Swiss-Prot record:
Protein name: Nucleotide-binding protein Rsph17025_2562
GO molecular-function term, one example from the UniProt record: GTP binding
Family: Belongs to the RapZ-like family.
Residues involved in ATP binding: 15-22
Function: Displays ATPase and GTPase activities.
Amino acid sequence: MSEPAQEYRLVLVTGPSGAGRTTAVNALEDMGYEVIDNLPLSFVPRLIEGPAIGPPIALGLDVRNRDFNATALIELIDGLTQDARVQLEVLYVDCSASELIRRYSQTRRRHPLAPAETPAEGVEREIDLLAPVRARADHLIDTSEMSPHDLKAELARWFDRGAATRLAVSVQSFSYKRGVPRGVDMIFDCRFLRNPYWVESLRALDGRDAAVEDYIRSDPRFAPFLEKLRELVLFLLPAQLEEGKAHLSIGFGCTGGQHRSVAVAEILGKALAEAGWPVSKRHRELERRAAAVLPTHQGEKA
């Protein structure tokens, strides 16, 4: 009986110029990844030809790539995700527009998308260009208030394969109307909880607001649900770690992805962090709304 084929472990690293992508790929190289920077997108499929041997690969991609465009990158991500031989993670190194402009002004560098214009014009253009890619990221790290040392430490939490005693957990909220996120290991449906949307004073808020959380907690079904959820997840995490898993993604869905799923993701994330597990949080629909309203949006820390 033949053994199952080994998986390629591939991390795609992207994000706006000046956010820290180069620092990120250098940090991954220090962790033992084979780093390939600015490879043309059309060449990437060649990386997974033949047997999967050697260290995991970190592939740096940005707007300076010769054939870069967001649509092509998303198509590449879709293709790699569907390939059973590939274990893919997409890392988006983000930064607020104001901080990117400050960094460009401080270093007096020209922006690659606007070499003859102001840094602000290049930054705005690049954030708009990369918005669809940002929405597809598995890991989102906002470096707006990070030093290079802080970024390296955060990356080590998620990607240091030598840290066999760690299991990184991500919790994310989403709207069922927009589909289930890819790459989620466990999904919990929060639509049975009382919906704050129907309370006029809560409609414009989201699950991170105390008033919304209090309303959801007032549902008599919430407390037993949270107790059982916390007990289940804390039971499963050590078992997942024993199986060699480095990352576990937990999704929470509701109708609009604004109130119930966000609140539950926040509450469970806090409970897991208090129990000692590295946790990151993402709220997909809130990120999409922020990107649509304000093109030069500030990145949300994962």
